[in-house]
Amino acid sequence: IWLAGLFHDIAKGRGGDHAELGAADFARFARSHGLPAADAQLVEWLIAQHLLMSFTAQKFDISDPDIINGFAGKVADREHLDYLYVLTCADIAGTSPKLWNAFKDQLMADLYTATRYVLRVGLEHPLNAEDIRAETRNMALAKLMDAGFSESDVQPLWETYPEDAFLRYRPDQLVWQTQGVLSQAAMPSQILVRELVGKDSLEIFVRTPDRDGIISGLLATLDRLNLSVFHARILSSNDGYALDNFITLKGSHTPDSKRIAQTLSAALKDPASIKPAKHLLPSRLRHFKTPTRIEFSSAAGDRTLMSLVCADRPGLLADIGYVLLQRKVRVHDARIATFGERAEDIFVLSDRDNHALSDPAVLHDLQAALLDYLEGRKP
């Protein structure tokens, strides 16, 4: 690990792939110092692949069994997984204390745990979505029954959840959501807020009658509350409710959980009317020029995948949500990743009728509107 840490970024700034160049540097070092072949091969692999785990966890949906199976195939065995996990966590935390938070800790741990399971049972027995859903249900139900709920209390709510919910939520998230929704059943909308381990992040869950403007209004409101969203899970229930889950990083003047819930509740009265707040670009970001790049591709389930790379800045997600609302585009999932001063976000989209955005003119108009908004040419 020490050697991988010393060499993993040694080739930055030399042009080309710094991971491959660093691995080549280490290979020469290992030969000249007579390191054992097996150890040298392991460290060389770690240097070459040191971004693999972080990239997979932040850019892809690790609740998807295919993603886990593919990652397990690249790692190949438990030894490589263990070393890569340690190096990845150390690399993120060592780059800047602000980059390491409770959410990234959980994200890396989830990827590690799922991959370890695949490697234990064997790559010839890949993860199966149906098995994961069943296990998640059973684990969550057992915890709820321990807390005093009966199966008859829980099942009516769970029957309204889409099957994807039991694939994308962890058992502890389902327990938390279920307890909160049932305790607030008399309310028109249920809003839950909890601190994550480490107390630098919050998880927020909103269940509310589905309608236009919810995501845009919630993102704008969270921004006004000085909460930076870095993960959003957006689902729709079978009985017409939006199920929106956000992981946010606390700001310097973040209000308490009760005030956050009250503010979000007020915003839900007319979410489509809430416009993004205006922000001055921090001086530290003015010297970074990241060209905005927007690409569209087809996604499973009659959806469109939008990949967006741009300079990170305050209010970015709120602005994106507002443009999507104006163009009558629905958001079904969002994965937000920040690498230094660059944001790399992925959104799963559809039109208002829940179909993919297939018209080239519509995609061109959406791309142009986003470019105008994100590059300061707001209409």
Locations of the language-model features?
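Divalent metal-dependent catalytic cores for phosphoryl transfer on phosphate-bearing substrates
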Residues: 1-125
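Regulatory modules associated with amino-acid/nitrogen control
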Residues: 66-379
